[in-house]
């Protein structure tokens, strides 16, 4: 009791290893690219890079919206209803997290064949498979945090179940749902393995990074990596900040 407890300091020291491990490569790649600024400027003005970035941003955004459209209702059902096979449904939702992404590409190609091959539909299909669990689980957790008594009060006052959902449940769960949408977007824009197999074209920035690295080496692929990472991190931070303000 009399001694000073250093437990938190110990835990902070241990945890700082991961912080440094994650932050260091980001700092290093930005620093090295800053020293090769001419290459960065040249890459930014490359029409192929611009188109690839546009493809990545548009398909990731479409994926996040589709994840919300179908994931929010499913998350509500999982939060409010106990039914036979619920554990199986939850397991199916989490399966994409553990499947290797190249295998995901093969699975989608075997299932849908030419319907998604080398198309925007294929890119979105690959992104959706790996990112949907984040939207669904975040929505479920958000609705679980909503006190059911509030919903019951609204129902006793004459509100329909649908009106109660939109006026009570959804607004309270919205921060968690928004976090899930951000994670779905981030997971989609970071996907490479499945997209390489399903839809090499139209080319996304992720695939272009791999192509440049394989064909031209590290120096050629680094500027695209920095640009994609900068855009992704910028959007991610801004959205997180907006959600934080909404919560407070």
Curated annotation (Swiss-Prot):
It is found in: Cell membrane. CDD domains: TM_PBP2 (cd06261). The keyword Transport applies. Keywords: Cell membrane, Membrane, Molybdenum, Transmembrane, Transmembrane helix, Transport. Residues 1-9, 78-91, 137-164, 245-248 are cytoplasmic. Residues 53-239 form the ABC transmembrane type-1 domain. InterPro entries: MetI-like (IPR000515), MetI-like_sf (IPR035906), Mo/W_ABC_Transporter_Permease (IPR053405). Residues 31-56, 113-115, 186-223 are extracellular. The chain crosses the membrane at residues 10-30, 57-77, 92-112, 116-136, 165-185, 224-244. GO terms for cellular component: plasma membrane. It is a multi-pass membrane protein. It comes from the Archaea. Part of the ABC transporter complex WtpABC involved in molybdate/tungstate import. Probably responsible for the translocation of the substrate across the membrane. The complex is composed of two ATP-binding proteins (WtpC), two transmembrane proteins (WtpB) and a solute-binding protein (WtpA). This is Molybdate/tungstate transport system permease protein WtpB. It comes from Pyrococcus abyssi (strain GE5 / Orsay). The lineage of its organism: Archaea, Methanobacteriati, Methanobacteriota, Thermococci, Thermococcales.
């Amino acid at each position: 009791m009399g001694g000073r407890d250093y437990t938190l300091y110990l835990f902070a020291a241990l945890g700082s290893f991961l912080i440094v491990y994650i932050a260091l490569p980001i700092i290093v790649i930005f620093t090295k690219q800053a020293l090769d600024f001419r290459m960065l400027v040249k890459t930014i003005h490359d029409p192929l890079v611009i188109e690839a970035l546009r493809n990545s941003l548009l398909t990731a955004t479409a994926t996040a919206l589709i994840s919300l459209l179908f994931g929010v209702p499913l998350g509500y059902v999982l939060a409010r209803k106990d039914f036979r096979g619920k554990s199986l449904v939850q397991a199916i939702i989490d399966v994409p997290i553990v499947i290797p992404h190249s295998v995901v590409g093969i699975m989608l190609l075997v299932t849908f064949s030419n319907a998604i091959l080398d198309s925007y539909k294929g890119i979105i299909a690959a992104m959706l498979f790996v990112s949907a669990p984040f939207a669904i689980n975040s929505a479920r957790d958000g609705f679980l945090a909503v006190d059911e008594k509030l919903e019951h009060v609204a129902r006793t006052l004459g509100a329909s179940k649908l009106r109660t959902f939109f006026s009570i449940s959804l607004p309270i769960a919205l921060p968690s749902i928004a976090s899930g949408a951000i994670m779905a977007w981030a997971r989609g824009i970071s996907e490479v393995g499945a997209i390489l197999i399903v839809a090499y074209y139209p080319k996304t920035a992720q695939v272009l990074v791999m192509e440049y690295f394989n064909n031209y080496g590290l120096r050629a692929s680094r500027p695209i990596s920095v640009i994609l990472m900068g855009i992704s991190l910028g959007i991610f931070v801004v959205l997180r900040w907006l959600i934080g303000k909404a919560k407070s």
